């Protein structure tokens, strides 16, 4: 008997006052996979993540998640001068169980230390969060989601702007989480990363253009539909053309 999916999205439409962000989106997210959300700016990637998280109210349709959900937001350059250590930030993941006003018990501190070690940040546990690089902060936020013991992990552009070693290390962490049976959904603009690192790709442009293995979802025809024809073949590699470029 096949396992039930981790999450099911049926006929999801999300409309804001001035625009419709998602239109009749339906998909099933299996257990134990890394799913890439790919699409142009304004395609609805972040809106879909928020719908899965439960922080966006659908205008129509439904979202069902079997298990707990953790969210890793985009990491900006500012706002990191708070007097918090990496361990303090990771420990915030326990507040769902303990509440914000209670002192976390020792077991929660152990869980936070284990999560930091799992993302390769154990040796930085006592460092102030503002002293860490962007890639290191991203790992700390992932550790916070792990402390939540989330079954469905949602990440908003975690490898954007990362150097090659950081991207590889982060991707290896996601693969390990997948192998533990978690479902990992990653919003990204990086076609090469999604093709190499994701088990499934959901290509969005306000609606689902394609959903399946990267070789199918990221073929030239699907990409042209999602990006308005701004896709060119460079030495056998499909890339997004710069604005104003015309493919021959």
What do these predicted ranges mean?
Residues 53:
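Helix-to-loop junction immediately C-terminal to a conserved catalytic motif
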Residues 106-124:
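Conserved ABC ATPase "signature" region
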Residues 128-132:
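Conserved ABC ATPase signature
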Residues 153-157:
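Catalytic Walker B motif of ABC-type/P-loop ATPase nucleotide-binding domains
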Residues 206-216:
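Conserved switch/coupling elements of ABC/ABC-like ATPase nucleotide-binding domains
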Residues 219-248:
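ABC ATPase nucleotide-binding domains
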């Amino acid at each position: 008997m096949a396992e039930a999916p981790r999450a099911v999205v049926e006929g999801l439409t999300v409309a804001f006052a001035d625009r419709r962000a998602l239109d009749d989106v339906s998909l099933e997210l299996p257990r134990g996979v890394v799913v890439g959300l790919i699409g142009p700016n304004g395609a609805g990637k972040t809106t879909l993540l928020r719908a899965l998280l439960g922080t966006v109210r659908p205008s129509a349709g439904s979202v069902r998640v079997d298990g707990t959900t953790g969210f890793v937001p985009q990491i900006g350059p500012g706002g990191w001068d708070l007097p918090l250590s990496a361990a303090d930030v990771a420990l915030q993941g326990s507040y769902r169980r303990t509440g914000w006003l209670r002192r976390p018990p020792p077991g929660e501190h152990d869980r936070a230390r284990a999560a930091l070690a799992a993302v390769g940040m154990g040796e930085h546990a006592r460092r102030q969060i503002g002293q860490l690089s962007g890639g290191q902060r991203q790992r700390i936020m992932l550790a916070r989601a792990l402390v939540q013991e989330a079954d469905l992990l949602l990440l908003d552009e975690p490898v954007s702007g990362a150097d090659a070693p950081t991207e590889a290390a982060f991707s290896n962490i996601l693969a390990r989480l997948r192998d533990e049976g978690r479902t990992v959904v990653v919003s990204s603009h990086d076609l090469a990363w999604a093709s190499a690192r994701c088990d499934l790709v959901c290509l969005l442009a306000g609606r689902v253009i394609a959903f399946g293995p990267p070789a199918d979802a990221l073929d030239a025809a699907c990409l042209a539909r999602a990006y308005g024809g701004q896709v060119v073949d460079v030495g056998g590699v499909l890339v997004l053309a710069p604005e104003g470029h015309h493919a021959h």
